[in-house]
């Protein structure tokens, strides 16, 4: 909580412009640093209020705040959201016509802008740099600062040029912000952006309102439909798929089943992507099915779930993508369907990726950490936070491993059977095969392929009849995750690793996990929705307020959350204010609009129906 007094200009802006009564977490300290001319490197989880950390100093300090952002497609929405609050904001990027660009430039030079958003590539232009020389600059904000990391999952080469900001304007404070960075990535950001002297602010990475669940993949589109129908009916969410074809197929399946779903991937025309993104942001209950091309910078507070139908490449990517759920602090779900084919596919992608051996090793380390998170029998939240160097006592009570702890078992003998089969195929026959053939050999199946290669003559043929096919596939998946097997080639053939010999020589025990018999539901079976935890009598009013908000948003041509967020509507439904004065006591309602009287009428009607 902030220590600011009522006369603090920053606190005054927070209340008067943004409608909040107090700062959260590190916000006050960050803002104080920048307002007083200091540099800052800010790590704050999605939904933690990063934007206020540069927007408020830009409004308090003289001059215009310049925000460097890679999110060209979202700049219009960001500017519109600020304009709705009375903030003078504009953007410069390649989408503007010459006439519109000149209008923005005139406004900037005339001192008529509080915030100017620019793309990083724009700062490589001498014309843009000369333009900024002609106006007082309040600060430089470098958003999505992890894009400067050459080892990161969102590397943008143009970010490497941003050290020019300090060289050209040494007295202007800079603030670099990201939601995702390990200690090594933080150090790289500071080095490459010339921020070694900046004060670091590292908030907790914990998102306690998100329930983390990773399930064995089995007909994933049906699993997804079950999740949406039972826990998130009519709610906004994001579904991530690895390929464009999977995006199109999944979106079509959802639409066929009565769900408002839209596709988003780089293969779609820019106009279609823009239209689908606009619908997702502005309408309630839309599900976006997308590749990872979608999501960075999406400022939609009421995303109730993020689902992955394919394995993310890294923990950083997983954390950033799941962090797009529940920005409003209300209960939300991060759900991942994960199977053997995911591991094989990701290993193949690494093997065939561009770059040198060091780059591939780094990709492998990222994947290993993601696989460890998937296969853990401990609290997933604790392991996720540990990856970012933060401690958690565990037993969070809101991840699948805490709600239904999986059993661990000694899988050493099973591992030896798999590894021995791979070894004998290679050593005795000079052959390499994928998972399916290895499992058929272990189960002693009389298939055409087994007979053709005379695999029934191997000593390991049929030694695995103590486990089912699915159980053997789970064993192979966990061996791949633990680095005791790897895959090679376009066909994903299984190959031993240096560590395999320790298991075959009985010098290493292999622990494995049994999956729970029944799927885990969010919050011990309760619906993880915006209406969760509301008293039953308050739910009708909450839904009435959401309907009123949808109408207002459509009339004003703005996203619904710009009118009021779900958290604010929950507060109103609970408090049932009967006057503007009482409405002002609800968090998020300090800034009144012309809609306030209409909203009170909605409350009165809802109260009569109680």
Task: Tell where the protein language model's regions lie, with residue ranges.
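Short alpha-helical segment immediately N-terminal to, or the first helix within
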Residues: 33, 308, 373, 571-572
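Residue-level signal for threonine
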Residues: 24, 125, 182, 496-505
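Residue-level detector of conserved catalytic or cofactor/ligand-binding positions
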Residues: 589-606
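Helicase motor core with emphasis on the C-terminal RecA-like subdomain
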Residues: 2-4, 8-12, 16-17, 25, ...
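C-terminal or mid-to-C-terminal helical accessory/interaction module adjacent to the motor/catalytic core
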Residues: 344-397, 406-409
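Accessory DNA-binding and partner-docking regions appended to nucleic-acid-acting proteins
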Residues: 2-13, 363-364, 393-590, 594
């Amino acid at each position: 909580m902030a220590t600011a007094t009522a006369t603090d200009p920053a606190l005054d802006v927070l209340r008067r412009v943004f409608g909040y009564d107090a700062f959260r977490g590190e916000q006050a300290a960050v803002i104080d640093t920048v307002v007083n001319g200091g540099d800052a490197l800010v790590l704050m989880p999605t939904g933690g209020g990063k934007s206020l950390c540069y927007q408020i100093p830009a409004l308090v300090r003289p001059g215009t705040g310049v925000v460097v952002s890679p999110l060209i497609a979202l700049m219009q929405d960001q500017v519109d959201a600020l304009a709705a609050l009375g903030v003078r904001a504009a953007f410069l990027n390649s989408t503007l016509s010459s006439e519109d660009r000149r209008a923005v430039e005139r406004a900037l030079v005339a001192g008529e802008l509080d915030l100017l958003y620019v793309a990083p590539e724009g700062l490589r232009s001498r014309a843009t740099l000369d333009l900024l020389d002609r106006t007082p600059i309040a600060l430089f904000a470098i958003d999505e600062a992890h894009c400067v990391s050459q080892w990161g999952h969102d590397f943008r080469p143009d970010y490497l040029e941003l050290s020019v900001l300090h060289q050209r304007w040494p007295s202007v404070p800079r603030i670099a912000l990201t939601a995702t960075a390990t200690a090594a990535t933080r150090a790289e950001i500071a080095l490459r952006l010339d921020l070694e002297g900046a004060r670091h602010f590292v908030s907790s990475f914990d998102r306690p309102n998100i329930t983390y669940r990773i399930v064995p993949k089995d007909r994933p589109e049906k699993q997804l439909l079950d999740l949406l129908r039972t826990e998130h009916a009519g709610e906004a969410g994001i579904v991530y798929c690895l390929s464009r074809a999977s995006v199109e197929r999944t979106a079509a399946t959802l639409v066929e089943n009565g769900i408002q779903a839209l596709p988003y991937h780089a293969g779609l025309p820019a106009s279609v992507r823009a239209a689908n993104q606009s619908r997702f942001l502005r309408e309630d209950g839309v599900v976006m099915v997308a590749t990872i091309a979608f999501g960075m910078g999406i400022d939609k507070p009421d995303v109730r779930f993020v689902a992955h139908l394919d394995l993310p490449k890294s923990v950083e990517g997983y954390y950033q993508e799941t962090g797009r759920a529940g920005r409003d602090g209300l209960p939300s779900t991060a759900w991942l369907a994960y199977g053997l084919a995911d591991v094989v596919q990701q290993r193949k992608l690494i093997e065939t990726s561009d770059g040198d051996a060091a780059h591939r090793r780094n990709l492998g380390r990222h994947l290993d950490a993601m696989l460890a998170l998937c296969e853990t029998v401990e609290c997933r939240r604790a392991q996720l936070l540990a990856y970012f160097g933060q401690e958690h006592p565990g037993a969070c009570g809101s991840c699948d491993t805490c709600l239904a702890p999986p059993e661990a078992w000694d899988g050493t003998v099973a591992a030896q059977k798999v590894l021995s089969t791979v070894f004998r195929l290679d050593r005795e026959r000079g052959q390499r095969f994928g998972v399916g053939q290895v499992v058929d050999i272990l189960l002693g199946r009389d298939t055409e392929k087994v007979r053709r290669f005379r695999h029934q003559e191997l000593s390991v043929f049929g030694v695995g009849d103590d486990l089912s096919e699915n159980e053997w596939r789970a064993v192979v998946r966990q061996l791949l995750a633990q680095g005791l097997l790897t895959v090679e080639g376009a066909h994903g053939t299984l190959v031993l690793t240096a560590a395999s010999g320790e298991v075959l020589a009985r010098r290493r025990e292999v622990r494995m996990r049994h999956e729970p018999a029944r799927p885990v539901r969010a919050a011990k079976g309760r619906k993880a929705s915006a209406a969760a935890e509301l008293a039953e009598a308050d739910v009708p009013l909450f839904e009435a307020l959401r309907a009123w908000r949808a109408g207002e948003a459509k009339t004003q041509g703005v996203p619904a959350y710009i009118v009021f967020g779900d958290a604010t509507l929950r507060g109103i439904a609970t408090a049932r204010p009967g006057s503007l004065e009482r409405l002002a006591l609800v968090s998020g309602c300090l800034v009144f609009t012309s809609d306030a009287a209409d909203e009170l009428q909605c409350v009165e009607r809802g109260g009569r129906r109680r």
